Structure formats: structure tokens, C-alpha cells
């Protein structure tokens, strides 16, 4: 599916960013079930720079806005050549001001939180670039090439928002690896109004 020309990606992103904010108590650093895998100095620096966002209110103050839904793939999913193992992502907070042709380790476009009790706990960051901005070349960061291009992930973005992305689980161990999109250790409450369980096939 082709992406709209010019700067049309701004409108859906801004509409997405204007979504109702999730009300949550500030969250402390998430205790891990097991030790985190060793991180490169670059990843350690990114984790330290983003630690302030363990409080989601600080994230909102700095321009991140909740997309509300807790994204879960209980049976895994496929999206063309991209495979999502069984697991969840969580609640995405998007900062449209960070979208551009250069990826900054200290300025991810998306922060990801897990609902735990009555709080949101920071678990991961996501580097995201619309296909139009990437200008035909898959971007990379932390020695990893972003997955894509792929259609926008409904229901939190329009399918016309084709993009590249990379999830990095900086604060919660991912049994399948730090750069795997879904995390089997992350849980979305099945009874919660805003939990979105996606089926075996994304599209």
C-alpha cells in the first residue's frame, strides 16, 4: 500500500497523539524476574537518558502522548514477512516531535509501558520512522536495522502509515531477546477496556 505524498503523515500522527491520556500513578523502575542481558555502552547510555520516563507524567510533559490501547499478541501474529511471537507490547506513548530522518538514541519516538496494578511501568522504547521520511532506505540504530517497511498497526494508527520500527526492551527482560517486538513477560489485562488482543494474522 503506497504512502500518501508530501507531509500527509503529520495529520494521522497528530490525531494519534491527541488521543485521550491514560491516567496512571508515577511508576518506579520495574523489578526484573531475572537479570537483564549485558548491554552495550550505547544501550546503557540510552537507558540512563530515558530513566526519567519511568514516570509517565514526565513523558507527557516532554511531549509523549498515550495511544491508550494495551497491545497484546496472545497467539502471535504475522504481518507480511514480519513475525510477532506470542506475547504483548503494552501501551505506546508517541512523541511526534522526535520523528525525523535521523534516529537519536536519547530521543525514541515511542515509549512503551506495561499496566501493573494501578500504574504504568516503563519497559521498552521504540525507534520509529515513516517510510516517506526514510526515503527508501531502512534506518538503523544500536547496530540493528529497523524492521519494515510495514503498514500502520491498527487500531492505534492508520494502515496507510507505512513505517520502520525497532523495539528495545531496556527495562524488562525479553526471553526472546532485547530487540524482539513482542515480550512474553509483558501482560495486558484481558478484562481491561483498552486491551487489544490481535489475532494470528495482523492483516
Residue ranges and their predicted role:
Residues 12-23:
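Bacterial N-terminal signal peptides
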Residues 32-203:
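Primary mode marks residue(s) on the alpha4-beta5-alpha5 output face of response regulator receiver
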Residues 2-14:
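Bacterial N-terminal signal peptides that target proteins for export
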Residues 24-33:
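Boundary at the C-terminal end of the N-terminal hydrophobic targeting segment
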Amino acid at each position: 500500500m503506497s504512502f500518501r505524498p508530501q507531509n500527509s503523515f503529520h495529520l494521522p500522527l497528530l490525531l494519534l497523539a491527541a488521543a485521550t491520556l491514560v491516567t496512571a500513578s508515577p511508576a518506579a523502575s520495574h523489578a526484573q524476574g531475572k537479570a537483564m542481558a549485558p548491554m552495550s555502552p550505547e544501550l546503557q547510555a540510552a537507558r540512563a537518558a530515558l530513566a526519567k520516563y519511568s514516570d509517565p507524567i514526565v513523558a507527557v510533559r516532554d511531549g509523549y502522548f498515550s495511544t491508550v490501547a494495551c497491545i497484546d499478541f496472545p497467539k502471535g501474529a504475522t504481518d507480511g514477512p514480519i513475525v510477532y511471537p506470542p506475547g504483548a507490547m503494552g501501551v505506546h506513548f508517541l512523541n511526534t516531535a522526535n520523528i525525523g530522518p535521523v534516529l537519536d538514541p536519547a530521543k525514541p519516538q515511542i515509549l512503551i509501558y506495561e499496566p501493573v496494578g494501578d500504574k504504568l511501568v516503563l519497559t521498552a522504547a521504540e525507534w520509529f520512522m515513516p517510510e516517506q521520511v526514510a526515503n527508501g532506505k531502512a534506518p538503523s540504530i544500536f547496530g540493528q536495522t529497523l524492521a519494515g517497511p510495514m503498514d500502520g498497526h491498527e487500531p492505534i494508527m492508520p494502515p496507510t502509515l507505512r513505517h520502520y520500527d525497532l523495539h528495545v526492551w531496556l527495562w524488562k527482560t525479553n526471553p526472546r531477546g532485547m530487540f524482539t517486538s513482542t515480550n512474553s513477560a509483558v501482560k495486558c489485562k484481558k478484562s481491561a477496556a483498552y486491551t487489544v488482543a490481535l489475532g494470528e494474522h495482523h492483516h
